[in-house]
Amino acid sequence: FKVCILRPPMIYGPNSKGNFPRLAKLACKTPVFPEWHNKRSMLYIDNLAEFVLQAIERELSGIFYPQNCELADTVEIIRYFAKAAGHKVWITKLLNPFVWLGSFVLQPINKMFATYYYDPEMSKMEFDYQLVSFEESLKRVADSLK
């Protein structure tokens, strides 16, 4: 038999649990947000499902790191969800010292603003599992929050 190990990053989608929907809801409520750019590997649930289907059909074995084609940035995600909700949010670097300091003391701050990503080369496959673009996936999540 063959063993296929998947090591996906944060999985998100409509009605998902965890930090991503909290971030989306925060974007619709907060008047101000730090301009602390980062890089995040993420994977939309439909793209994960397609990867699993392809792995089964092709009888893949090994360790795989599926992720979206584009690396995400928390600031850009906040901008997207705020705009989709018709909410104005002021993104400023004035709060960055608090993010830097808070990341050492508070785990949730570190989780939100830290850079966590796989090298995109690790995720390239001979088949296409990216059925939904990053922007379209954000739109679907935003629509599910309405």
Predicted regions: what they are:
Residues 40-43, 72, 129-132:
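Residue-level signal for the nucleotide or nucleotide-sugar donor/cofactor binding architecture
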Residues 4, 41, 70, 92, ...:
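Residues that recognize and position ribonucleotide moieties
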Residues 55-108, 132-146:
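Mid/C-terminal beta-alpha module of Rossmann-like enzyme folds, strongest
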Residues 1-14:
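Conserved beta-loop-beta element that borders a ligand/cofactor-binding pocket
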Residues 3-5, 32, 65:
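Conserved active-site beta-strand element of glycosyltransferases/polysaccharide synthases
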Residues 100-126:
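Mobile cap/lid helix-loop segments that border enzyme active or cofactor-binding sites
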Residues 14-22:
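Short beta-loop-alpha junction of Rossmann-like oxidoreductase domains
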Residues 25-43, 47, 51:
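A conserved pocket-lining segment of Rossmann-fold NAD(P)-dependent short-chain dehydrogenase/reductase
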